[in-house]
Swiss-Prot record:
Reactions catalysed: ATP + H2O = ADP + phosphate + H(+)
Annotated Polar residues bias: 529-545
Short sequence motif Q motif: positions: 36-64
The Helicase ATP-binding domain, residue ranges: 67-238
Main EC class the enzyme belongs to: hydrolase
Compositional bias ranges of the Low complexity kind: 427-441, 458-500, 508-523, 550-579, 606-616
Stated name of the protein: ATP-dependent RNA helicase VAD1
The gene coding this protein: VAD1
């Protein structure tokens, strides 16, 4: 009798295509539950169908506590780690309470960034795909107001957006919020900061007094307590932050000079088994410069920051989620709420300034209890921030070891597959006579450094073939379009990571080198030959004076003087200063132009010599 009842309850699963199960191990951040199921919450059948097709098997700890209380209509103040399922904790009860027979806005979800709004609206549509006539709308800054006005003339049940655009539409009467009974704030600590607090209070005033307010975040500053006392009624508080950082994320730091950061990043790319990676910089200018350097190294990457056009930002975010590239260079724009399951490595190219920023950055890896790796590149000036962040977060960031075991950030099944696959046997490739002469000419060029090609062919492919492939990769240079590098083949990341030997280059000229296999041997950066410009490539720090070039290079870069040229600028065809004598005001020696420090041979000065005054 019980079995027939269970079968009847599971009839709704027939005909639904469930996604393949994720066999990767999970940490206690998402597995330490009481054994509840989504069917135990009394959700509507259409919503259960959406949860099943989305691949949600069992609720996480935050979902297990938040969903039942949210279904009762009570205010909720929830604090949980990044990547533990906070988004579904408020979307599932919100969808369950929506009445699609009504045409007005019934739920308002506020998020701090446009990318997070795009992701949240997509989750609403995915989980509510089987709810008939459900209408979800997203509105953010950077889009035309006319399109939003036309869209709001049609029925909208859930409105997702950023605070500024929501207040603009609500204050003008375009978006009717007077019947909105559910008010949700994701990443509430950011929304309740000084930048958003006045906008939030004005928007909340447009909603009715009988409303449900739900706040979700990983960190709660003192401003949250003030908001709770003023606008929430006996909220149900949930705190699952026994520790701030995720248990599945391994954290390392490495001390490097600013001029060697690009070279260190290249070494990490070649040694780590990267599925997808996010690289963070502290300024928009450095984001674009680093993305160009990564592309020049032969790796495909996108970049994104707040100064880009909204259409480009949406396209970058969409393509990166769909696996169009492995690497994304960005600012702190994508530190909050962005959920990309394939990201297993986060690199802080610039060390964050605050503990809050560091916490949200490393939370982009190890999503939903999976394994991840966070590596920070530090200069000597960053060591004080390192100690402060460690003390504030109560965590320990270890120095990067000589060997990084892939078990720490790669799924065990993939690691075992890599170890069990035998290395390919070397094969002698006989080139046709027409190709013999070009190979002879290639031998005259300096050989490719060993640290660049060692990870490509551990099984001993011919050296000439390796050099030829390296030169073919370095010949063309792509012009970045919104951060996009050379295209990559559409293959699963698991297959791409397990490539045992270098394959012939495809039709496009550049391709990201295959990630290394086995444990990563981290070595100190070797001395660079003159033929490798990227090793010494330096991205200027914002606000820092560029390094002074030698005088010989300055003269080679001088431009002919133009009429109206400012006094003191370089003149064309000027002979170098051969000597100067110490003077008390104006240089007296041959070509001497020094004031005070012109006494040693070869020291240029700042004053004009008498001969130059006579010519003037």
């Amino acid at each position: 009798m019980a079995s027939s009842s269970t079968l009847a309850n599971d009839d709704w699963k027939q005909g639904l295509a469930a996604p393949p199960k994720d066999l990767r191990p999970q940490t206690e951040d998402v597995t330490a539950t009481q054994g509840s199921r989504f069917e135990d919450f009394g959700l509507r059948r259409e919503l259960l169908m959406g949860i099943y097709t989305a691949g949600f098997e069992r609720p996480s700890p935050i979902q297990e506590q938040a969903i039942p209380m949210a279904l009762t209509g009570r205010d909720i103040l929830a604090r949980a780690k990044n990547g533990t399922g906070k988004t579904a904790s408020f979307i599932i009860p919100t969808l369950n309470r929506i009445n699609t027979s009504l045409s007005h806005i019934q739920a308002l979800i506020l998020v701090p960034t446009r990318e997070l709004a795009l992701q949240t609206s997509q989750v609403c549509k995915t989980l509510g795909a089987h709810i008939p006539n459900l209408q979800v709308m997203i509105t953010t800054g950077g889009t035309t107001l006319r399109d939003d006005i036309l869209r709001l003339q049609q029925p909208v049940h859930i409105l997702v957006g950023t605070p500024g655009r929501i207040l603009d539409l609500g204050s003008k009467g375009i978006a009717g919020l007077n019947k909105c009974g559910i008010f949700v704030m994701d990443e509430a600590d950011k929304l309740l900061s000084e930048d958003f607090m006045p906008v939030i209070e004005q928007t909340l005033a447009l909603c009715p007094q009988e409303r449900q307010v739900m706040l979700f975040s990983a960190t709660f500053p003192w401003t949250v307590k003030e908001f709770k006392d003023q606008h929430m009624v006996q909220p149900y508080e949930i705190n699952l932050m026994d520790e701030l950082t995720l248990k599945g994320v391994t954290q390392y730091y490495a001390y490097v000079e600013e001029s060697q950061k690009v070279h260190c990043l290249n070494t990490l790319f070649s040694k780590l088994q990267i599925n997808q990676s996010i690289i963070f910089c502290n300024s928009t200018n450095r984001v674009e410069l680093l993305a160009k350097k990564v592309t020049e190294l032969g790796y495909s990457c996108f970049y994104s920051h707040a100064k880009m056009q909204q259409a480009h930002r949406n396209r970058v975010f969409h393509d990166f989620r769909n696996g169009m590239t492995r690497n994304l260079v960005c600012s702190d724009l994508l530190t909050r709420g962005i959920d990309i399951q394939a990201v297993n490595v986060v690199i802080n190219f610039d060390f964050p300034r605050t503990a809050e920023s560091y916490l949200h950055r490393i939370g982009r890896s190890g999503r939903f209890g999976h394994l991840g790796l966070a590596i920070s590149l530090l200069t000597l000036e960053d060591r004080h921030n390192l100690y402060r962040i460690e003390s504030e977060l109560g965590t320990e960031i270890a120095p990067i070891p000589a060997v990084i075991d892939p078990v720490l950030y790669v799924a065990p099944a993939m690691v075992e597959e890599e170890r069990e696959s035998p290395p390919p046997k070397p094969a002698a490739i006989a080139a046709p006579p027409a190709q013999q002469q070009p190979q002879q000419r290639q031998r005259q060029h300096p050989p490719v450094p060993s640290h660049q090609v060692a990870h490509h062919s551990p099984a001993a492919a011919p050296i000439q073939q390796q050099q030829q492939q390296q030169q073919q990769q370095q010949q063309p240079q792509y012009q970045l379009a919104y951060g996009q590098g050379p295209p990559q083949p559409q293959v699963p990341f698991q297959q791409a990571n397990s490539s045992p030997a270098p394959a012939p280059l495809p039709s496009y000229p550049q391709q990201a080198p295959t990630q290394a296999q086995g444990p990563a041997q981290m070595q100190s950066p070797p001395s660079e030959p003159a033929t490798q410009p990227q090793a010494s490539a330096q991205i200027p720090v914002q606000g820092q004076t560029p390094p002074i070039q030698p005088r010989a290079q300055q003269q080679g870069q001088q431009q002919p003087s133009q009429p109206g040229q400012a006094e003191g600028q370089s003149q064309p065809n000027r002979r170098p200063n051969t000597g100067g004598f110490r003077g008390n005001g104006r240089g007296q020696g041959h070509r001497g132009r020094g004031r005070g420090r012109g006494g040693q041979p070869g020291h240029p000065g700042a004053g004009a010599s008498q001969s130059q005054q006579a010519q003037a």
